[in-house]
Amino acid sequence: MGAVTTDVEVASSVPAQTIYKGFLLDMDNIIPKVLPQAIKSIEIISGDGGAGTIKKVTLGEVSQFTVVKQRIDEIDAEALKYSYSIIEGDLLLGIIESITSKFTVVPTDGGCIVKNTTIYTPIGDAVIPEENVKEATEQSGMVFKAIEAYLLANPGAY
């Protein structure tokens, strides 16, 4: 079947630099703080925090999954781009080789637009269930909205 790709764009009234720093660069700290039931912790297991860094993400009690390994693929602070791939873990269902999320934050008058492309790469000819992709897209949207609400309530945080 091949890879499955989703594209999502979300407008926000939070400034682009704030979204980039809070939502993407500091996700290790902000997500467990804002959504501890979804993600308990994120820790670096190798690397310096830049491209190539591997992180262990321990998921919270609302997730049916437990732990994933995530690799940072790109950090471009000037272009406000960030990408990472999930490369190990039960979330891959034994049929997905990797899930790559690519973010670009685009400044607008009074805020920004966050563009996210997610690529689900199957193992061999495996078919990735459409409902899993839809659920993951919805959950990502909920995480973004929760972090956006935190950033709006704490304008000096980033």
Curated annotation (Swiss-Prot):
One of its GO terms (cellular component) is cytoplasm. SUPFAM superfamilies: Bet v1-like (SSF55961). One of its GO terms (biological process) is abscisic acid-activated signaling pathway. InterPro entries: Bet_v_I/MLP (IPR000916), Bet_v_I_allergen (IPR024949), Plant_def-hormone_signal (IPR050279), START-like_dom_sf (IPR023393). Disulfide bonds: none annotated. Keywords: Pathogenesis-related protein, Plant defense. GO terms for molecular function: abscisic acid binding; protein phosphatase inhibitor activity; signaling receptor activity. Signal peptide: none annotated. Belongs to the BetVI family. PANTHER family: OS08G0374000 PROTEIN-RELATED, STRESS-INDUCED PROTEIN SAM22. This is Pathogenesis-related protein 2. The gene is PR2.
